[in-house]
Amino acid sequence: MTAPFVLAVPSKGRLQENAEAFFARAGLALSKPGGARDYRGTIAGLDNVEVAYLSASEIAANLARGSVHFGVTGEDLLRESIADADRRVLLIDGLGFGYANVVVAVPQAWIDVRTMADLDDVTTGFRAQHNRRMRVATKYINLTRGFFAQHNVVDYRIVESAGATEGAPAVGTAEMIVDITTTGATLAANGLKVLDDGIMLRSQANLVASRDADWSDEVRETARVILDQIASRARASKYKEVRTRFAGCNEALLAEAHKRFGVVSPFGGPTSSGMLTLHCPPAQIYGLGSFLREHGADTVSVASLDYVFDKDNPLFSKLAAFLRQ
């Protein structure tokens, strides 16, 4: 029996809910035949897919090992835990949830420290005065080392943090921190501020592929189907379908509509009877409808699109190119 295609998704909380909703919108409903507490699942209509419910950090580790084909996890975890991440995994697509920034934060009382260059000066002075290096509390050890090296900050040492990193300066276990934040409210509540150029990484949940997984022909075909579904849903979300028919509908009018409203005519120009189907950005719907009526249309209908399939599959092309490298 051919080994299954393994998709790893978060096992709890909002990340799990958002991941399941994302796949459901693409027509890829995840289910747990063994019940809510089961850590294995399936996708309706894809018999050779096994869904593995794991923590976000476990997903990153399994992508690195090649024991899953696709995984949903944050870019911050990939960059932190996988050496040479761009060679070993592919960020296929950002999923639009799980947004957070990895940042350098210092006490608000450091009024003269606003940039990494200022921090370099302060760390150098701190070592000269105290005969020890300034401490940085973080769980992002590799990201911190890389970012500080880019800014030529060397007089520091990392204090590994297991949790509640933002409290480290207040309790005296570190002078500053590198941590992940969404709004910055928790940092501010702990008397910290983000440096002006201290955003190390703008992260979100991504659909990620592993280079080291077993990419058999059957598995690649499954990946193509999954990515085709996702791409068709993304394409559909950008447009509404507009339909009309009137005698004055011609190629010149269509060209003007393309230029003014950013429409796409997926089935070509108007038919001999003046029938026209357009895909229009939602923000331009009223303007387009008014334009068509001004030029003779009696009725213009607008409908939502569920999926728009195209001969091109840009997400799968991206994956195929990555696996060829």
Swiss-Prot record:
InterPro entries: ATP-PRT_HisG_long (IPR020621), ATP_PRibTrfase_cat (IPR013820), ATP_PRibTrfase_CS (IPR018198), ATP_PRibTrfase_HisG (IPR001348). Feedback inhibited by histidine. It holds the Pfam family HisG. It comes from the Bacteria. Its cofactor is Mg(2+). It is found in: Cytoplasm. It catalyses: 1-(5-phospho-beta-D-ribosyl)-ATP + diphosphate = 5-phospho-alpha-D-ribose 1-diphosphate + ATP. CDD domains: PBP2_HisGL3. GO terms for cellular component: cytoplasm. Keywords: Amino-acid biosynthesis, ATP-binding, Cytoplasm, Glycosyltransferase, Histidine biosynthesis, Magnesium, Metal-binding, Nucleotide-binding, Transferase. GO terms for biological process: L-histidine biosynthetic process. Pathway: Amino-acid biosynthesis; L-histidine biosynthesis; L-histidine from 5-phospho-alpha-D-ribose 1-diphosphate: step 1/9. Coiled coil: none annotated. Its main location: cytoplasm. Its EC number is 2.4.2.17. One of its GO terms (molecular function) is ATP phosphoribosyltransferase activity. Catalyzes the condensation of ATP and 5-phosphoribose 1-diphosphate to form N'-(5'-phosphoribosyl)-ATP (PR-ATP). Has a crucial role in the pathway because the rate of histidine biosynthesis seems to be controlled primarily by regulation of HisG enzymatic activity. Belongs to the ATP phosphoribosyltransferase family. Long subfamily. HAMAP family: HisG_Long. This is ATP phosphoribosyltransferase. The gene is hisG.
